[in-house]
């Protein structure tokens, strides 16, 4: 497997993870092993049956059941990966990569690495991550999952330390601070010393009360562009001319709160102050209208 975590359509080989989809749209994730077997209610097949076969190979078993085999995407892996801690799900991981603006070479301080789902996504974007994690079993699981998905070479960009982020951050001039913690507002003062001016803090929190606490912690001088959002994911049923929203949707999982640090002593314009700004016609300037200097 290449360091970017994708086998580029090559045939299956020993040690590969394989995403299996049966004819009833049930999903499985296996690792190809010597003498391994995949057991189902419709029978079994040997892992050796897939070695050397191309991606998209479909195996037929009893009762008309078929099993299509693919290299897993990042989404497939996150949903089926071994875990100790609760993971951040794909519907939030995608927006996090955009809101935190993760880029190749980005220096990230991540606290609360959990099972490594978000770490894997940021590493695939080319980030260099220093992770703080309290529990050794979670840290080991995160390293194992990252290596399993992205290969051993990526571990040179992934340094997970047994540290308590509430007690401080040693790193300086980092680009991003990404938090998945019960009380991330306690880390905001430490992020102020860790981030360079223009850096971004992002906190993932399950409850709006937690998100509110983070926002309150970022009300001081030096923080701008604070915002909080959640992502709701609703699929659609499309069959012929029948089109409707799915009866089930992936609704609330967590809140994403971000802010940019511009440096101690810098005073941001507050929302209340923005509302008092008027143009020459005494009309409020809307947030989505450009402000032109004379």
Report each predicted region and the residues it spans.
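S-adenosyl-L-methionine
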Residues: 132-184
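N-terminal auxiliary segments of SAM/dcSAM-dependent transferases
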Residues: 1-71
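Conserved SAM-binding loop and adjacent beta-strand
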Residues: 8-10, 80-94
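Conserved SAM-binding loop of SAM-dependent methyltransferases across substrates and taxa
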Residues: 115-126, 193
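Conserved class I S-adenosyl-L-methionine
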Residues: 103-114
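Short beta-strand element of Class I
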Residues: 127-132, 201
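Glycine-rich helix-loop-beta junction characteristic of Rossmann-like nucleotide cofactor-binding loops
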Residues: 98-103, 169, 193-194
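C-terminal substrate-binding/active-site "lid" region of AdoMet-derived donor-dependent transferases
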Residues: 185, 190-255
